[in-house]
């Protein structure tokens, strides 16, 4: 029982979850109802962060200067923290500092996706509510209701349901 007590309180981090998912055999993946040739469970853990093209996150011109889009600013923060984390690992910084940077990186990536996270509503560096990907897609001004569901949209995959003329 002593040797199992340590495992009971062990933290589950993304790297450990990825390792566990990668060790699932092909037959077990099929038992989970997944097709191993099309996708495996480890595909659900991001290993690379998608960065949209500049056309999706344009600079906004103001009177004296231009400001970058929220997603561009957040990508810059993520790159900076990732660089500091890599340098800290190479230089042998204390474990607590590495853990703090790792957790801060996770928070920044979560805000990159959804800017309205509970407890993290505003970004303290910019002093305003961030518009992450979720805010750009949902709501009245979002991509779906604001652009794709309008009356004058062609090639959006919508069909018109009408009664049978016979």
Which role does the model predict for each range below?
Residues 1-166:
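Conserved core architecture of multi-subunit DNA-directed RNA polymerases
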């Amino acid at each position: 029982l002593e040797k199992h007590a340590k495992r009971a309180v062990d933290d589950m981090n993304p790297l450990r979850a990825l390792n566990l998912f990668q060790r699932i055999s092909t037959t077990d993946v099929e038992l989970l109802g997944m097709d191993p040739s099309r996708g495996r469970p480890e595909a659900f853990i991001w290993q690379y962060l998608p960065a949209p093209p500049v056309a999706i996150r344009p600079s906004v011109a103001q009177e004296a200067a231009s400001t970058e889009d929220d997603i561009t600013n957040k990508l810059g923060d993520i790159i900076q923290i990732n660089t500091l984390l890599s340098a800290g690992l190479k230089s042998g910084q204390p474990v607590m500092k590495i853990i703090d940077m790792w957790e801060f990186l996770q928070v920044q990536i979560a805000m990159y996706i959804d800017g309205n996270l509970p407890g993290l509503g505003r970004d303290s560096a910019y002093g305003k509510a961030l518009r992450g990907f979720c805010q750009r897609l949902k709501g009245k001004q979002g991509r779906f209701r604001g652009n794709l569901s309008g009356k004058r949209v062609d090639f959006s995959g919508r069909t018109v349901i009408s009664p049978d003329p016979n």
